[in-house]
């Protein structure tokens, strides 16, 4: 008569062998994927190097800046290559091109002259997507050594840029907050109200990354969720995993407002600095100063007025210089 463990031993050995085989298969797949990725990266890098070698022969090209995934992240088979060029001073007919190198698309996103290079970078709003695109980039060729130092300085996000980015992001966040409330309370459509919570996730992530002194980029949402899942889950992971009930949406919207209140100091900073002369500023004046649209910034201005930080007033204006009819435009004033 066979003992129980005599029968069990071969089964245990077979199971152990099967587990080892699966582990070996997984390890082999991982190695193959790693090799495939290495080959792909090498191909993209070779394409970039090949194009740079060609550009070096053009005496008009002063510098080449590599941007996008190849400069700091991981490329995949459908990636393209992003570059920017600095050229000698001249009148340019085109400021961008889409070219091909080794059957890979290369986007020359901008072509700027040497004298206009600094002005171009300074024109980019601190924390904007273009700012982040170039901030994650690197100069891979230059005949002007001074460009290296200036480009690295450009990547630093100062306190003023940080505050401006938070202000403009808060403007967008307040818009989503109001839309969420409208579709929940007035339209009685909680599903569409939840859509605005999802849109708010990216804006909150931008503020979170910016508040840490980093330049927000395309991966801001991933970073913010990793750093603060407790905050982001209501607008990101939880909001994507199931349909919220009206009370859940209401709670998330209320948390959104409390989030803005916690960041009031940095949100109001650019506005109060601009209004420090205590003169009335129309919404048109404010939007021009911050290089945005009136309809985009009015919401956060009214929010600051509701909080008693600035006063909402009006100023008589004319639609055109030749208009006789005077109308009232919304304005704001800082009364300390």
Language-model-detected regions and their locations in the chain:
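Conserved NTP/Mg2+-binding pocket subregion across the NTase superfamily
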Residues: 29-40, 46, 101-188
């Amino acid at each position: 008569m066979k003992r129980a463990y005599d029968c069990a031993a071969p089964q245990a050995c077979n199971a152990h062998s099967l587990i080892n085989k699966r582990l070996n298969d997984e390890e082999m797949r991982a190695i193959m994927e790693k090799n495939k990725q290495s080959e792909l990266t090498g191909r993209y890098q070779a394409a970039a190097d090949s194009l740079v070698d060609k550009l070096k022969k053009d005496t008009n090209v002063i510098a080449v800046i590599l941007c996008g995934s190849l400069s700091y992240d991981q490329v995949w088979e459908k990636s393209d290559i992003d570059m920017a060029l600095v050229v000698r001073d001249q009148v340019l007919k085109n400021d961008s091109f889409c070219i091909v190198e080794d059957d890979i698309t290369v986007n020359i996103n901008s072509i700027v002259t040497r004298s206009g290079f600094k002005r171009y970078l300074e024109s980019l709003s601190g924390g904007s997507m273009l700012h982040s695109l170039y901030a994650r980039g690197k100069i891979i060729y230059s005949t002007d050594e001074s460009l290296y130092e200036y480009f690295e300085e450009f990547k630093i996000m100062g306190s003023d840029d940080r505050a401006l980015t938070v202000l403009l992001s808060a403007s967008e966040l307040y818009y989503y907050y109001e839309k969420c409330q409208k579709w929940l309370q007035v339209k009685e459509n909680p599903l569409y109200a939840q859509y605005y919570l999802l849109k708010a996730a990216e804006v909150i992530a931008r503020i979170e990354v910016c508040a840490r002194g980093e330049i927000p980029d395309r991966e801001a949402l991933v970073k913010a969720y990793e750093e603060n899942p407790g905050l982001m889950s209501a607008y990101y992971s939880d909001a994507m995993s199931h349909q919220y009930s009206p009370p859940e949406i209401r709670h998330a919207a209320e948390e959104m407002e409390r989030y803005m209140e916690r960041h009031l100091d940095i949100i109001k900073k650019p506005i109060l600095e601009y209004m420090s002369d205590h003169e009335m500023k129309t919404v048109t004046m404010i939007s021009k100063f911050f290089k945005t649209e009136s309809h985009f910034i009015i919401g956060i201005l009214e929010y600051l007025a509701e909080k008693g930080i600035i006063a909402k007033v009006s100023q008589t204006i004319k639609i055109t210089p030749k208009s006789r009819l005077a109308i009232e435009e919304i304005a704001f004033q800082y009364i300390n």
